[in-house]
């Protein structure tokens, strides 16, 4: 959508790029072997320059299983039409369970460990958080790809440390 605004005419030399593609350009990736993840591709995927699974695997490693189907949130669908959203959610839950089984069978996620599902959409993140207690072995943890990367690269306290540095001017 932003491509239609022709920002380069207002700001010559500027370009619009997704954060995931920017991180790849800068060579910021997770070291290989950092565990397994489910990936939920949003209906409105911000990754426009290439195959999103290729981008995700380049960022966080090859141990990623794509979790198909809509999360059921679809903007405000979960709130405005819970009857429809619940049916969509049921199908997504089946996909999450399949992905969980694949990750556990491959050994990338231990039998008693939580499964992480990553996305890049705020609405989807809200929807995916609704599945938190639905797995049989452990919980489903939903987060953004870039947040998971920040946690693994900078540590669990990356956000308060970042805020503190920003408040101090740098």
Residue ranges and their predicted role:
Residues 1-170:
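Iron-sulfur cluster-binding electron-transfer modules in prokaryotic oxidoreductases
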